[in-house]
């Protein structure tokens, strides 16, 4: 049994909690804090000296030691973290609200990787006293739940940071058609700047957060593209919208000051409002009146430059240069791609992390946040992007990925090469590595079999065997994945469905066109019922995955989506049977020519595309309408 000296009681308790993840052999480890290198481990013959600079780094050091002792007796390792703060932010606003048990599990793994900070992105998913519609039926965290999560992070000397919204991205709240909510609204999902009741709401946000020990918060304010152009415009006329942003920011910062918080905010709106074409990555000319405001506010807020797309260091460097025109207090947010359907893209996350890390180091950035967004339903599993998180940890502490697989296996029990096979539903053989967002996992699954509006973005002769092989690979990995087996079981079933579904709509049309009623009958009576059965199995597996990781709220959306898909397959069966029985002289849906869904990659030599909004994949009809 391992014997430690130099641990305080809290550290000893934390190590007990981590025993389920890592184990050390019968050795002696002398632990001490040092103001020099981040992590230093030296020794042999069962006796080791371990030092750490910041308390949270102890747990990575022990993981690194466990890895090293698995390879040999003599250990001599030094690591120097490039970033003072390395954070992971879990999105809890796109229906999937991480449950408390899973938040604790995530904190444990992050501690072993060397993260300093755990963040939760909560648009309306925390409770505010006196605001019953805020988080209504959305699984909003109580103050007690947030306190429990924070206390667990503190057990590992990690900081907990809430990420909220104080301007836009509040659609789940402002949709409610009651006066007390609508009077807070400017347009779309944006709050009405200047309305005093808005600042009462924001005060309530901070009142809830003040029950935590942390005094660091991200106040959001990103993607408020139409700010000042709805009710604000009617009430106040045309104004300089960059100045309007500054005025609102100052009011929010004043409220934050009242509760003792230091704020971060996403930086994009300043650039979008001051650039000539409304884009984030542009040079900007700052109007003088806005410059006066920014000079006054810049020391009160940290700007977070977020970028999940660039495949070269130079592109990040250019955007850092633009940010420094506004402020020197800049943090960086990269992405662990879990927002394009059921399947993540750790491979692309690795590519962009390597380049972003180079630029962050070159620009002396001291804080990096890895974001795990969950766009359009939070369907990707929370723990599916663990490889991306380990990649950023390795880049921070080592500036290379030489030990990535060994460290990852210590922390998860699975090699990173095996774990990253979870991406397979997105990794079609003909796709280049440097394109983001291409997501056949989602649009092949959700598209209709009678009205397959994305059919031309599939290459069945390539895709069908790819998905079938992926299902087999993932099933094999499931057997050795331990606590993470559920992830691979779900993905294996998804890939099996994709293999069945990728050509069925096309074959229905081809058989109908040539009058092949034998094939139509075989599809309607055998293939489509089998496909429904496969989807029902997937729904059960997905539901288990969801309930393991998240609160139940939000699962209703997936029930509706998959239930609709099943009913549409039944409709296809009945339409084909009616045609075969002579009850219909034609199937109208099969006579409509399929047009391009988009032209994003029209000049490329592959078929796949990006389609990430369920309501546009599932039907050409209107779901959102008046």
Which residues does each predicted region cover?
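Short, surface-exposed beta-strand/loop "edge" segments at domain boundaries and coil↔beta transitions
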Residues: 9-13, 33-39, 50-60, 500-503
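Short, well-ordered secondary-structure micro-motifs within conserved domains or adaptor modules
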Residues: 2, 16-52
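Feature activates predominantly on carbohydrate-active enzymes
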Residues: 5, 44-264, 331-334, 339, ...
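Residues that cap or initiate secondary-structure elements
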Residues: 8-11, 33-36, 56, 66, ...
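Substrate-binding groove of N-acetylhexosamine-processing glycoside hydrolases
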Residues: 1-25, 70, 108, 148-151, ...
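Residue-level preference for short coil/turn positions at secondary-structure junctions
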Residues: 35, 44-46, 84, 297-299, ...
């Amino acid at each position: 049994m391992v014997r430690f000296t130099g641990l305080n009681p809290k550290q000893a308790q934390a190590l007990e909690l981590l025993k389920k993840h890592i184990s050390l052999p019968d050795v002696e480890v002398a632990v001490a804090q040092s103001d020099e290198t981040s992590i230093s481990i030296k020794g042999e013959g069962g006796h080791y000296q371990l030092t750490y600079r910041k308390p949270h780094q102890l747990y990575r050091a022990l993981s690194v030691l466990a890895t090293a002792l698995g390879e040999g007796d003599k250990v001599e390792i030094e690591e120097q973290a490039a970033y003072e703060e390395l954070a992971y932010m879990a999105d809890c606003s796109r229906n999937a609200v991480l449950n408390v048990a899973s938040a604790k599990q995530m904190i444990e793994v992050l501690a072993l990787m060397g993260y300093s900070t755990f963040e939760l992105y909560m648009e309306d998913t925390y409770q505010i006293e006196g605001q019953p519609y805020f988080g209504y039926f959305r699984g909003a965290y109580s103050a007690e739940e947030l306190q429990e999560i924070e206390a667990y992070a503190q057990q590992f000397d990690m900081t907990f940071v809430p990420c909220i919204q104080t301007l836009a991205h509040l659609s789940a709240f402002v949709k409610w058609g009651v006066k007390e909510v609508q009077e807070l609204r400017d347009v779309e999902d944006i709050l009405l700047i200047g309305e005093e009741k808005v600042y009462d709401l924001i005060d309530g946000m901070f009142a809830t957060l003040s029950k935590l020990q942390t005094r660091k918060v991200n106040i959001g304010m990103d993607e408020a593209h139409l700010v000042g152009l709805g009710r604000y415009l009617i009430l106040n006329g045309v104004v300089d919208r960059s100045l309007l942003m500054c005025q609102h920011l100052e009011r929010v910062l004043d409220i934050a000051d009242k509760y003792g918080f230091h704020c971060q905010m996403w930086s994009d709106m300043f650039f979008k409002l001051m650039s000539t074409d409304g884009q984030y990555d542009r040079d900007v000319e700052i109007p003088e009146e806005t410059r006066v405001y920014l000079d006054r506010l810049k020391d009160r807020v940290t700007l977070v430059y977020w970028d999940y797309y660039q495949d070269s260091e130079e592109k990040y460097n250019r955007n850092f240069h633009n940010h420094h025109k506004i402020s020197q207090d800049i943090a960086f947010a990269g992405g662990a791609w879990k927002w394009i359907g059921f399947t993540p893209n750790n491979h692309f996350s690795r590519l962009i992390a390597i380049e972003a890390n180079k630029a962050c180091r070159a620009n002396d950035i001291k804080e990096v946040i890895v974001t795990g967004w969950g766009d359009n339903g939070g369907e990707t599993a929370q723990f599916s992007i663990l490889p991306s998180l380990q990649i950023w940890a390795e880049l921070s502490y080592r500036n290379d990925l030489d030990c990535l697989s060994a460290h990852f296996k210590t922390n998860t029990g699975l090699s990173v090469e095996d774990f990253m096979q979870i991406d397979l539903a997105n990794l079609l053989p003909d796709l280049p590595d440097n394109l983001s967002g291409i997501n056949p996992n989602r649009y092949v699954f959700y598209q209709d079999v009678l009205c397959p509006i994305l059919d031309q973005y599939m290459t069945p002769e390539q895709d069908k065997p790819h998905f079938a092989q992926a299902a087999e690979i993932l099933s094999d990995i499931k057997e050795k994945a331990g606590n993470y087996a559920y992830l691979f079981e779900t993905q294996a079933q998804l890939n099996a469905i994709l293999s069945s579904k990728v050509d069925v709509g096309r074959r229905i049309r081809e058989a109908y066109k040539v009058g092949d009623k034998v094939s139509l009958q075989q599809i309607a009576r055998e293939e489509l019922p089998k496909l429904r059965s496969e989807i029902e199995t997937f729904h059960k597996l997905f539901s288990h995955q969801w309930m393991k990781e998240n609160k139940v709220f939000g699962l209703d959306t997936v029930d509706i989506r998959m239930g609709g898909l099943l009913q549409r397959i039944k409709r296809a069966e009945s339409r084909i049977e009616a045609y075969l029985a002579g009850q219909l002289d034609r199937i109208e849906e099969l006579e409509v020519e399929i047009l391009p869904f988009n032209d994003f990659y029209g000049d490329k030599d592959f078929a796949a595309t990006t389609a990430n909004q369920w309501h546009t994949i599932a039907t050409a009809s209107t779901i959102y309408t008046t």
